[in-house]
Amino acid sequence: MRIVILDELLSREMDGSNDGSSARVNSLKHVIKRNKMDMADDAPSSLDLMRRIFQAEISREIHQIMERHTRTTLLPAIENLRKNGHVVDESVLNGLYCNILEAAKKPYQKDPEPMPPICTNGNGFLDINSQEHENNLKRGYESDSSDVSGVSHCSDAKRRRGRPRKDEEAYRLEMTPPTMNEVIRWNPDRIDVNTRFITATKIAQVMGMPPSILFNKYPRMFRYSCDEDDKNILHEQNLLIRAPGRCYLLVAEDARQLVPSTYFQDVLNVSFLISEPLLSKIRQKAASTYEKYKVFLPTQPNNYL
């Protein structure tokens, strides 16, 4: 439609111009030519143009799938490797993601061309002449040097440390709509100065499972991932033992539906109150998730479960 309009404008300008070489005519010709170059003239090009338009959204969804499987399917293996002294940093995970994407491409790729038959002599051995034998030796030497180089690069990659912290967003872990009880637990209005908290490690110990399995079993449970400043504050207040890895805070009252009733009092005994600055950060984090969840509520609840 855009090309049709431009052609009509060009036709009018050509009719009003004596020699058809005015600046406006030349400008319209240039615009029409540029628009035609951007147009797809076959099905693959047209679909690829649509792909480029939606590529950012597609890539974001793929990234969410990778994160979900990292936090659920792969997390026990990652934790086990780290306990055994292995380094599982961002470069290792990125390599794993690339392998996953490469494997996912195979069903959509063309079948490989058939290999030519291998020539053999009468004794069943490969029939190669001396020149081919010499070339194979050279390729073998080059392969050896490449292998050594690859090992050195791999060693350099393993020596790198550090992985950027990523926010924990429970709404990404499952595709099914959350229940009303799950939504209400993220309401920031239920969190005040009298709210008692407990670490996820303590709850997991009572339930006899690691925290990763706890979050896999209850992917939408309310939790707050402490950053380094939060952990330092809790450590200075003797509320947290300094340890490597992430620290999650849960609302102690939420444990009533998780642990057996006989152990709930033990949970309350090790729970604690937190200071206002940290409480404000927790409420802010809860509010962002609650805004995404509350669309599933039929009506605004007046009390909290």
Curated annotation (Swiss-Prot):
It comes from the Eukaryota. It is found in: Nucleus. Ubiquitously expressed. It comes from Caenorhabditis elegans. This is Suppressor of activated egl-4 protein 2. Keywords: DNA-binding, Nucleus. The keyword DNA-binding applies. Residues 138-168 are annotated as: Disordered. GO terms for cellular component: nucleus. Residues 158-170 bind DNA. As a likely component of a histone deacetylase complex, together with saeg-1 and hda-2, functions downstream of the cAMP-dependent kinase egl-4 to regulate the expression of genes required for egg-laying and foraging. One of its GO terms (molecular function) is nucleosome binding. It holds the Pfam family DNTTIP1_dimer. Interacts with phosphorylated egl-4. May interact with itself. May be a component of a histone deacetylase complex containing saeg-2, saeg-1 and hda-2.
